[in-house]
């Protein structure tokens, strides 16, 4: 039996995780799960730092990932990777699947600029102050990952090159 594969894009808000995820799907046919859609449903009127919300959202994400892997051999999803619930979810998924993490690198000012110019319909709406707090925490946590993608003004072609190298190592090995 083939081991199902999970790729997790980890990085600050505005680093390009969603865009890179769509490239995984469009170019490499690796299903990109928009977990932020699930988070928006779970959020209701709660603060994004609400412990019950955070716990519930990662439970919903893990359940959704597991469901998706019933139909797909490989999936990719994104996270800032900040909470203990994220860490717990990763450990749980690693027990049953091959899981690789990719750090998306982008400078703080560039992330904020991207957030201000992107469509908000697919993202949880947060203030500049919240974005800065979240991104500062992401940079401080500095999660160790299996791979890195530099998205500081990378062109689509440069991103595809970086993704292709990772796909060769993760999916086709």
Question: How would you describe each model-predicted region?
Answer:
Residues 9:
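Hydrophobic anchor at the beta1->P-loop junction of P-loop NTPases
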Residues 12:
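P-loop (Walker A) phosphate-binding loop of NTP-binding proteins
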Residues 15:
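ATP-binding Walker
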Residues 18:
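Walker A/P-loop
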Residues 22-70:
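Conserved substrate/cofactor phosphate-moiety recognition/catalytic segment
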Residues 56-96:
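Glycine-rich phosphate-binding loop used to anchor ATP phosphates in small-molecule kinases
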Residues 95-115:
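Conserved phosphate-donor/acceptor-positioning beta-strand/loop module used by diverse small-molecule
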Residues 121-162:
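Small-molecule kinase domains that catalyze NTP-dependent phosphoryl transfer to phosphate-bearing small molecules
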């Amino acid at each position: 039996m083939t081991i199902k594969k999970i790729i997790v894009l980890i990085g600050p808000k505005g680093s390009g995780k969603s865009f890179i995820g769509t490239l995984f799907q469009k170019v490499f046919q690796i299903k990109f799960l928009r977990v932020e859609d699930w988070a928006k449903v779970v959020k209701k009127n709660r603060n994004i730092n609400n412990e019950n919300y955070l716990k519930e959202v990662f439970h919903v994400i893990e359940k959704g990932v597991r469901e998706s892997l019933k139909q797909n051999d490989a999936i990719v999803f994104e996270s800032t990777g900040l909470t203990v619930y994220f860490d717990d979810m990763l450990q749980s998924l690693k027990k049953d699947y091959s899981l690789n993490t990719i750090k998306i690198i982008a400078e703080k000012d560039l992330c904020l600029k991207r957030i201000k110019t992107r469509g908000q319909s697919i993202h949880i709406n947060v203030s500049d102050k919240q974005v800065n707090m979240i991104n500062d925490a992401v940079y401080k946590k500095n999660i160790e990952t299996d791979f890195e993608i530099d998205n500081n003004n990378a062109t689509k072609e440069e991103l595809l090159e970086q993704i292709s190298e990772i796909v060769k190592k993760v999916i086709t090995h």
